[in-house]
């Protein structure tokens, strides 16, 4: 077996199939497993997907939320075992792949229209 085929086989076995399909502009609830010492807990991060990048095992996505008036962005590897589950709350209608312009918008201007 060549190196390329070996890498492809290992990568395919590591990909997760239990995740919903989502796009930029969608609102997600990401349940992340956090380990603190010997304790383990689930932390929920809810926000708008502002970008997706990469492909295969190295694919990542960034979720942005407003917490106490401060914008918080968190980037997650899509296929990591640390993500317990991803819930799709609503689908957003956007015409861009990267929503960096949301960083400069405040309040109602930062809303994204929902797909019916």
Swiss-Prot record:
> Which Pfam families does the entry mention?
Ribosomal_L19
Q: Which PROSITE patterns match?
A: RIBOSOMAL_L19
Question: Keyword annotations for this protein?
Answer: Ribonucleoprotein, Ribosomal protein
Q: Name one GO molecular function term.
A: structural constituent of ribosome
**UniProt xrefs under SUPFAM superfamilies:** Translation proteins SH3-like domain
Give GO terms for biological process. translation
Annotated GO CC locations? cytosolic large ribosomal subunit
Q: Which InterPro entries match?
A: Ribosomal_bL19, Ribosomal_bL19_CS, Ribosomal_bL19_sf, Translation_prot_SH3-like_sf
What's the stated role of this polypeptide?
Answer: This protein is located at the 30S-50S ribosomal subunit interface and may play a role in the structure and function of the aminoacyl-tRNA binding site.
Q: Which family does it belong to?
A: Belongs to the bacterial ribosomal protein bL19 family.
Specify the protein name: Large ribosomal subunit protein bL19
